[in-house]
Amino acid sequence: MAKLRLGALEAGGTKMVCAIGDENGTIYEQVSIPTTTPKETIPKMIAYFRDKGIDALGIACFGPIELDRDSEKYGYITTTPKLAWRDCDIVGQMQEALHCPVGFDTDVNGSVLGEVTFGQAQGKKCVMYLTIGTGVGGGIYSNGELHHGMLHPETGHVLITKRTADTYAGRCPYHKNCLEGLAAGPAIEERWGRKAVDL
């Protein structure tokens, strides 16, 4: 039986990682495309996948995103702090261009699923995956299921009590001083005047 040829898209706030692999977790190739605006970035992702002969595409995306399949906005990036991407129908655009099934979940749920399926969390029943990058997020896998909806932790937007001497206001457009607004990569760069990788 032939292996499925699968496309994978890790949609991040700084870069979009596009890859081709199979159901056994083998990655055949991958590219990184800078995340600018949907108008610039989505056509580049479509161009990468268009001639790859994929059977399906999985998208693990920064959020918040709409995961309710009954919603007219299923597949949209919704109230993201990445303003250019607000109300972007990423699934619809990819599906229309590539004519294949598209799976869609949060970037952190994609990461935790990868760890449970192929990585360090194989065989575990309950796993939480935390990430700090352009944003802050957390994904939960418990008893064979990824958590969604009210059970999905928007970890990055938990409000934080700062030290009284800390005068940094934070950079989240919604809460300012949430975890993401204070500790994600852009906040670190703004606080220290250098990229986090250089600290």
Predicted features along the sequence, with ranges:
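Extreme N-terminal starter segment of soluble prokaryotic enzymes
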Residues: 2-7
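A short acidic Gly-Thr/Ser loop motif
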Residues: 9-14, 131-135
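Residue-level signal for well-ordered, solvent-exposed loop/turn and beta-edge residues enriched
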Residues: 14, 25-26, 76, 145
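Residue-level signal for inorganic ion chemistry
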Residues: 18, 33, 59, 188
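Glycine/GP-enriched mid-protein hinge/lid loop-to-helix segment characteristic of carbohydrate kinases
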Residues: 20-23, 29, 39, 103, ...
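N-terminal phosphate-binding loop and adjacent alpha-helix
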Residues: 24-54
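Glycine-rich phosphate-binding loop and adjoining helix at the ATP-binding site
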Residues: 38, 42, 56, 65-126, ...
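Glycine-rich beta-strand-to-loop/alpha-helix junction loops that act as flexible
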Residues: 57-64, 132-134
